[in-house]
């Protein structure tokens, strides 16, 4: 009998019929888990390829992500090539996202081009009478000022009449009752001269034998920032540049300057000593030649900021030391027979009241009768100041700022832009001055090359209009650069516009002449900061305008400003679309070509950053610092400025970055990693430790920006 034939069944192995291999029990559990994940991933990829084959070529299953985002790497950069012709390798994680789609909060008006003048801030004036202007109905003779000093003010300093706060302070401080004084006045109302004029007038009435720099220190003036100290020093020098008081010598002691030079000036003799609390305390402790036994006036300028910046303990030590060293011998003179303390502040809040209670005794309360008090006791902004705000989606912030500047550089000669951190100042400075397209490169060639290694603090704003100059100022710059930048910006009188990018280091006390517009690109960290920022314009009776950028989730901040500082602030007509159309439209047109031009401007900068690694690093640092600074808003305002409401991808877009936020932060991470790639988190911290760390970091930020000491 023949053998039965052998039948063999062959089954073709494919992805769908393949079963996972049995895992060996002898292997480690981590290896088995890794194998399961790999098998699951291979199975998913196989199913995706099957769906793709079944879909055919009719284009019915278009990849949604590819329709929304274009991945590019190392684009072929040509500054003269239109944005839509950009070619790139599609293997990177960078994205080109649109500015004008996908955000319901944009609310673009379709008829903004019909009346471009309505989008101009300068087109809308105010008819209110200036609340900080010199009083025309009086003169300095009517407030007991010496005739020769009044003539000097009129002829050399172009000041013909006192302001309201000066009219209030001069008679009281020239009086021989010699009481302590609390001076409260609006920003830009002339507080510096309100206390300097009485000091100088009473010093010039001293006997002739005391008219020398070696007769002693008669006045000590403290201010929170180096820039404000330098400004007070300059005003004192101008005031004393006359035959009556030419012998009065002022000295400025601030951080960033050589202590050896300051000690040499003190040894030669000083009559008015001006300084920051930190540096002044250092000299009181370590400079033997500093004799404060004859001090008759102690002035605390910007008292609210002195307290906010953590100077309370330092101020207490300084005041106690001055009191202990006081040994006034000659009392029958024109100067006070006791040490008189004056506290100046634009706001009257709890911290200032606490300082007033400890530093002042039986003090006079001096305040302009023009200023009306709010319910909370805070002072208002000048009446003639036009205040606006605009709600801008995060990805449109950069082009909206550029549009605002482009539409106003012709009518406004000096513009100040406040940002939240120094890294953001550096980014916008570089973004505005860089040469990208052919016209900008041609303008850049005309400029003289800077010497290698120099830090540039001012340059032509090629990305705005080429005719304007842009400046930067923040606490990380050296004192020499900060001083020269302020001097250049203040003294500039040419036909072009001048734009100062700065942090809050320039928000307090600085009297920058003829500032027409203040832009708060980043919201202030407190309502007091808002008041002082806008106080850089509309000073001494001049008109001025201020506009603040807010994100859609931050609009509730307007109600807080109205209730806390009585801000008379209005919304900018037509919102961001009005700004963009005014800045990017060519002529009066009804078309929306401004959207294309704004997009082109943004994409040109993005391509430039992709090709330029140093600029890309600057943008990354600015993004990271902005997010960190955003987290330092007051706890009472945390519901308005909530970190969870930030769209980090759109915020990155406002810094011209195409990388995902996670990739940006990862590039800057310096945390040690364990073997295997996990981050060593270390010991977890309690909520109290984290809160204390945040407070300490905030104070370090203040110290850096304002250069304490």
UniProtKB/Swiss-Prot annotation:
rRNA processing recorded as keyword: yes
- Protein name per Swiss-Prot or TrEMBL: ATP-dependent RNA helicase dbp7
Enzyme class, one word? hydrolase
Which molecular function GO terms apply here? ATP binding; ATP hydrolysis activity; RNA binding; RNA helicase activity
Q: Where is this region: Disordered?
A: 13-90, 662-690
User: Major place of localization?
Assistant: nucleus
Gene Ontology CC annotations of this record:
nucleolus; nucleus
The record's similarity note reads:
Belongs to the DEAD box helicase family. DDX31/DBP7 subfamily.
- Which intervals hold domain Helicase C-terminal? 404-580
Q: Does the keyword Hydrolase apply?
A: yes
Regions of compositional bias (Polar residues) in chain numbering: 44-65
- E.C. number: 3.6.4.13
**What is the purpose of this protein?**
ATP-binding RNA helicase involved in the biogenesis of 60S ribosomal subunits and is required for the normal formation of 25S and 5.8S rRNAs.
- Residue ranges of the motif DEAD box: 301-304
**Which reactions appear under catalytic activity for this entry?**
ATP + H2O = ADP + phosphate + H(+)
Positions of the Helicase ATP-binding domain: 172-366
Q: Please report, in chain numbering, the residue ranges of the motif Q motif.
A: 138-167
Kindly list the positions annotated as binding ATP. Answer: 185-192
Further remarks about this protein from its record: Present with 1460 molecules/cell in log phase SD medium.
- List where Basic and acidic residues composition bias occurs: 16-34, 66-90
Cellular compartments annotated: Nucleus, Nucleolus
Query: What's the domain remark here?
Result: The Q motif is unique to and characteristic of the DEAD box family of RNA helicases and controls ATP binding and hydrolysis.
| Gene label | dbp7
Q: Can you cite a GO biological process for this protein? A: ribosome biogenesis
SUPFAM superfamilies hit by this protein: P-loop containing nucleoside triphosphate hydrolases
């Amino acid at each position: 009998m023949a053998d039965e034939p052998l039948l063999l069944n062959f089954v073709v192995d494919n992805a769908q019929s393949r079963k996972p291999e049995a895992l060996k029990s002898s292997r480690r559990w981590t290896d088995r888990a890794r194998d399961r994940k790999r098998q699951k991933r291979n199975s998913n990829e196989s199913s995706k390829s099957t769906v793709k084959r079944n879909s055919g070529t009719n284009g019915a299953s278009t990849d949604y992500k590819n329709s929304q985002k274009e991945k590019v790497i190392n684009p072929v950069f040509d500054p003269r090539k239109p944005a839509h012709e950009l070619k790139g390798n599609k293997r990177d994680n960078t994205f080109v996202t649109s500015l004008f789609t996908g955000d319901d909060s944009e609310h673009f008006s379709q008829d903004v081009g019909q009346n471009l003048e309505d989008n101009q801030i300068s087109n809308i004036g105010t008819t209110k009478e200036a609340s900080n202007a010199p009083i025309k109905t009086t003169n300095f003779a009517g407030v007991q000022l010496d005739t020769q000093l009044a003539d000097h003010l009129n002829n050399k300093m172009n000041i013909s009449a006192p302001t309201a706060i000066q009219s209030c302070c001069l008679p009281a401080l020239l009086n021989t009752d010699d009481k302590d004084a609390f001076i409260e006045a609006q920003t830009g109302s002339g507080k510096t001269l309100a206390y300097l004029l009485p000091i100088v007038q009473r010093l010039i009435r001293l006997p002739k034998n005391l008219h020398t720099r070696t007769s002693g220190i008669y006045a000590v003036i403290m201010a929170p920032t180096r820039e404000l100290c330098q400004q007070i020093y300059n005003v004192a020098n101008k005031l004393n540049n006359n035959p009556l008081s030419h012998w009065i010598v002022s000295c400025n002691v601030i951080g960033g300057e050589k202590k050896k030079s300051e000690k040499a000036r003190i040894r030669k003799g000083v009559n008015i000593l001006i300084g920051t609390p930190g540096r002044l305390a250092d000299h009181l402790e370590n400079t033997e030649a500093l004799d404060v036994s004859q001090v008759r006036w102690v002035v605390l300028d910007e008292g609210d900021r002195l307290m906010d910046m953590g100077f309370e303990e330092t101020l207490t030590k300084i005041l106690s030391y001055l009191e202990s060293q006081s040994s006034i011998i000659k009392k029958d003179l024109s100067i006070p027979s006791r040490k008189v303390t004056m506290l100046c502040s634009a706001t009257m809040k709890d911290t200032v009241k606490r300082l007033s209670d400890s530093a002042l005794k039986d003090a006079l309360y001096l305040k302009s009768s023009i200023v009306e008090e709010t319910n909370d006791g805070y002072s208002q902004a000048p009446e003639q100041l036009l205040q606006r705000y605009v709600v801008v989606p995060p990805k449109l912030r950069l082009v909206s700022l550029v549009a605002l500047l482009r539409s106003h550089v012709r009518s406004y000669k000096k513009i100040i832009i406040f940002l939240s951190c120094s890294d953001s100042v550096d980014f916008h400075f570089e973004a505005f001055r860089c040469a990208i397209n052919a016209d900008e490169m041609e303008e850049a060639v005309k400029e003289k090359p800077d010497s290698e290694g120099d830090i540039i603090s001012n340059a032509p704003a090629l990305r705005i209009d080429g005719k304007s100059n842009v400046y930067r100022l923040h606490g990380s710059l050296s004192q020499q650069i900060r001083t020269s930048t302020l001097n250049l910006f203040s003294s500039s009188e040419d036909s072009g516009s001048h734009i100062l990018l700065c942090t809050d280091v320039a928000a307090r006390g600085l009297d920058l002449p003829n500032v027409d517009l203040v832009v708060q690109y980043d919201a202030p960290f407190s309502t007091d900061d808002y008041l002082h920022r806008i106080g850089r314009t509309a000073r001494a009776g001049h008109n001025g305008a201020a506009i603040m950028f807010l994100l859609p989730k931050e609009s509730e901040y307007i109600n807080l400003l109205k209730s806390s500082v009585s801000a008379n602030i209005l919304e900018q007509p037509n919102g961001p679309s009005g700004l963009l159309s005014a800045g990017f439209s060519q002529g009066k047109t009804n078309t929306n070509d401004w959207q294309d031009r704004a997009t082109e401007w943004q994409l040109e900068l993005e391509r430039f950053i992709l090709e330029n690694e140093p600029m890309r690093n600057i943008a990354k640092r600015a993004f990271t610092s902005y997010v960190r600074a955003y987290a330092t808003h007051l706890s009472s305002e945390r519901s308005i400025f909530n970190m969870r409401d930030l769209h980090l991808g759109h915020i990155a877009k406002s810094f011209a970055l195409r990388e995902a936020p996670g990739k940006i932060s990862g590039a800057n991470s310096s945390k040690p990693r364990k073997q295997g790639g996990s981050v060593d988190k270390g010991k977890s911290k309690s909520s109290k430790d984290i809160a204390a760390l945040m407070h300490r970091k905030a104070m370090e930020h203040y110290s850096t920006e304002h250069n304490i000491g």
